[in-house]
Each structure stands twice: as structure tokens, then as C-alpha cells.
């Protein structure tokens, strides 16, 4: 063979080896960029680890997911930065939120503070309980105004987001300017309805019409005048969704992969501002990535192996079961079956406790502010409440719940919604007692709780209809005094009488 041929052959061989090396390297890079479906999106995880992480994700996510669902339901009707008014007391349908009350008219607004502040103006309201509560994406009540907190006269607030850096308008000073911990905030307005007459309803409706809530730019454009909610334009909500959200009536029913999708929505919504100093949360979110929950990435169940998917579903159900176990353990002070959520026992980082409240009463006033509540799911003997039985709750008239405003005794089905009944009666309250609409005898008020309509007219007057199966109470105390707040008030038990 000639020398030139040998050189050519060597050169060709070198090129071939070089090409092969390049192809091999390219194959490695492509494999790294497009890995085959693994049992996680973020590295290996065992079924046991996946189950544990999913349980933690449920406990952490129950409240944010509930708030996300709440915002979705309301913003479909009213958009954002606009009040949606309930012009009549809430009934069993439509279902807008768990454990509502039937003694106040609600106003609900979903605020997006990422672009500009929101203005809220409340005209002077006399001789009537009212409050406006601001709640963040963790269901924490971060600001309140109302008849218990403010002097008589007009009350206004400029609500600004955590990242807003604009110029403050004149006319707002000191306490008028409030910074939200999150770009999202829910605003919940309550105005007491002291009677069920048409005159009382019209009075409260007229007050609703004079309450203004709008963005700062809209307020300036209106000449800083009152504008009815019905005259405000509807600004559609713009946040992540996934197909099927509209068919989900309650976040409490979410199972397995659906719950994971909702947690993914929460993590990918920039308006849901996370805690900057939440050490526990930061570590938990890092763990969530191992089962596909990560900001910047939509949760995709198809990337999970069957055994990992099953483990996640089991972990979520375990978290739900552990949270609901607090119904037996209690979260505060137990008084004859009533669980008074003592503020001293409340911890913002106790996710199991928070998940419990998220499941039974998403917007529960815990810890107490303008009002507080007490939950009851069992009778005085410790047995689950059921419409198959009859019960009584007996108050001594000289030892009624100590409040400055009013108390209310609502009854809910086992999922936390009003029970649809022929009387449209969902609660009894202190206004009814004061107006003589409840029967009292021998210094006592006896409430009759049962599914069947009582034949005795006196019992019928004090009847609180219950569903055929399980039910629960979430008593409300507006303007609660110390015995309610610390749990020392001796609340009468729910006594089975059949």
C-alpha cells in the first residue's frame, strides 16, 4: 500500500472515530434533556417517601387550596376587585363557602393588589354590627375594620400589595394605609340582619349600596364618589386553571391527583405570595418537588410510576384522616363536646390544625378577632351527631353566651354546608331570643335538634332541622368576652333524648 493511501486511511479512521465520539456525546446530551418517564419529576423517591411527602403536602396545602377554590367560585360571578353582595341571607344553595352564617348579609371581594392598590370606603353605620375582614392566601385574617374597632363615622382604607411602589394619594393618612402580606387578598364584609322582616332587609341592602370598593385608578376616575357594586365593570380573573375546575363543588372532596393539581396551581400563582421567613415552609416546598410539585412546572401525573401515584393518593388520604382526627382530640378547650379554639393553643405553623379548620370551616375566625366560634361534632356522651336521633341544647337564661354583639347557633351537614329544609331555617340566634321569637320556660331556652318536624308547637318554635345522617355545629360569638375566648364558658352540651 502506498504511503499516501495509508495516510488517507488513517485520516478517514480518525474522522470516523471523531464522528462516533460526537454522536455518542450527542446521545448522552439528548438523553439528559429528554429522559424517559421516571417515577418522579424531580429525582428518585420510594413509595414510602412519596406517601409521607404527599401527606405533608395535603396538610400544608389544604388552606391555600381552599382559598384558591373560594376565589375561583366568586371571581366567576363578580371578577376581581369588585364586591359580590348577598342581598338575602345565605341558604343551602348555591354553595359558595363552607360554614357560612345566616345572621349577617355577606359581601365578598377577591382583590388583586399586584398592579395597584384597592380603595374601600364604608359610610357611617349606626346601631348595627358590621365588619370587613381581610384574609390572605393562607386564610390568615391580616386586617379588620368594623363597629367593634372603629369610632363612628366614615371608614376608609387604601390596601396596597407587598411589592407596590407608587405614589400615595392625598386623603389617606396613618391607619388608612394598610399593606397586605400577599398580592392576593380576600375581603369579607358582614352586616348583621337583626330581624327577618322585609324592612330590615331593605335597610341592610341600602347600606350595601353605599359601600365602595374599587381600584385606586377607578376611584380617582369616579371623582372619589360612592359607586354601587352593580355599576362597577367586571374585570375577569387571570390566574392559572385546569380543565374540570368548574365541576368541583367543594375542595373538601378533592382526591389524589386532583388535589395535587390544585396545589400545583397554588405554587404557580404569583399572586399567592409565600412567607419570606417561613423556614418550615421553605424546607417543605423543597420536599414537595420530589413528587412533582414545583413552582414553574405544572404537575403531571403521567410522569409518575403507578406505585408512586398510588402512594401519593394514600398519603393525601392519610393527611385528611389525620386532620379530621382533631375532631376527637380537639384543638382547644372542650366544654361538653364543644371545642373552643383557645387562641393560646393556635400556631400558624401547625399545618395539621390548619388543615382541620380548612376542612370543616375554611374561613373560621381563628384566632378570634371580631368574633370567634366553637365546633361541635359529637353529643354530650361523645357519640357522632346523627339525624337518626333527637337532641336538645338547654341554656339557662341567666348564663347565656357572654358577647357584646350577638351569638348564633348554625347547623351544617357533615361537609359544612347548610342543610336544605322546608323552613329555610339554618340557625337560631340571640336576636330571635331578644325579639321573643324563641320559646322560653322556667328560665331556660331549649333548642330542639332533630330531622323530623316536632308536633309540639313550642318545640317547633325552637326547632333546628337536621339532615338524616351526620351533621355538625359551628356556633358563632360576635364580640366575644373572655370566657368565650379562653374556653371557660360552660357551653351546654348536645344531649341525645331518644
Model-derived regions, located:
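Bacterial N-terminal signal peptides that target proteins for export
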Residues: 3-22
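Short, compositionally stereotyped local motifs that mark structural "simplifiers"
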Residues: 25-26
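C-terminal motif of bacterial Sec signal peptides marking the signal peptidase cleavage site
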Residues: 29-32
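A compositional/structural signature for long, glycine/proline-rich flexible linkers
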Residues: 34-498
